[in-house]
């Protein structure tokens, strides 16, 4: 019963609490740092044929078995744009392809690449402001299996979403964490719909090892940690 409290609204309590924003604290950085010289530009996806929204929603299912072969890079490019793509940069905040409470966008996207055209195998981070990738390190299949509690399947790429809670906490204090949970649902659903529209399959993973998932991506587990994952492969 205690866990159910997380699902309930606490907005009335905010009137008694001053957020860091209200205290005049500077906002956290909107993006993580990176070396611009190491950004891998992603393929253009503007001519990629897709199904209609109606057809896509009718066909949407969770896939756990995938065909062999590599995913074309333009399809991966499309999925990244559909899930965290930057539509407009307003300076203090950004508008993206997914909604986020107060446009706070507290997530980072990491990829465990096993079979994508034009990309070597390994772990990457998505750079939305450049629509590109940064290579982080070589893959580790043993640690991946531990991180996903042996739900490795045979997908070509695995999306990992991390959360930087303070991006949301800075404005919304105690209600931030429910907002974060709602927001990540928007992100993953966009992945399902976008993938289905280009003949790819998705299996979202909510059951994972927190310690090993954070270790796999090199996250500290406090200021940034994994909140969700999803397999993507050829359907």
Model-derived regions: residue spans:
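Small-aliphatic-rich amphipathic alpha-helix that forms the alpha element of a beta-alpha
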Residues: 79, 109, 157-168, 172-213
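Conserved hydrophobic/aromatic beta-strand scaffold that supports enzyme active sites
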Residues: 125, 158-160, 229-231
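Beta-rich nucleic-acid/ligand-interaction surfaces
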Residues: 96-102, 209-216
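N-terminal amphipathic, basic helical "cap/leader" segment at the start of enzyme domains
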Residues: 1-155
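A glycine-rich helix N-cap at a beta->alpha junction
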Residues: 218-235
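Short, surface-exposed helix-loop/turn micro-motifs enriched in polar/charged residues
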Residues: 101, 202-205, 222
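Short, mixed-charge aromatic SLiMs
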Residues: 130-132, 214-221
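Solvent-exposed coil/turn segments that connect beta secondary-structure elements
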Residues: 114-116, 164, 235
């Amino acid at each position: 019963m205690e866990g159910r409290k997380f699902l309930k609204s606490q907005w009335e309590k905010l009137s008694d609490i001053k957020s860091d924003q209200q205290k005049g604290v500077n906002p956290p950085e909107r993006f993580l740092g990176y070396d611009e010289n190491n950004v891998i530009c992603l393929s253009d996806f503007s001519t990629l044929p897709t199904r209609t929204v109606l057809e896509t929603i009718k066909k949407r299912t969770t896939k756990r078995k995938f065909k062999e072969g590599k995913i074309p890079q333009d399809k991966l490019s499309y999925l990244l744009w559909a899930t965290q793509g930057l539509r407009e940069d307003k300076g203090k905040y950004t508008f993206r392809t997914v909604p986020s409470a107060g446009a706070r966008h507290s997530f980072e996207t990491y990829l465990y690449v096993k079979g994508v055209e034009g990309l070597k195998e390994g772990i990457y981070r998505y750079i939305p402001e450049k629509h590109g990738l940064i290579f982080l390190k070589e893959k580790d299949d043993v640690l991946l299996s531990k991180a996903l509690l042996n739900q490795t399947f045979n997908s070509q790429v695995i999306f990992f979403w991390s959360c930087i809670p303070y991006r949301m906490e800075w404005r919304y204090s105690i209600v931030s964490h429910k907002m974060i949970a709602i927001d990540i649902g928007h992100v993953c659903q966009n992945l399902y719909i976008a993938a289905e529209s280009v003949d790819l399959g998705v299996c979202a993973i909510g059951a994972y090892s927190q310690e090993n998932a954070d270790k796999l991506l090199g996250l500290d587990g406090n200021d940034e940690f994994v909140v969700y994952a999803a397999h993507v492969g050829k359907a």
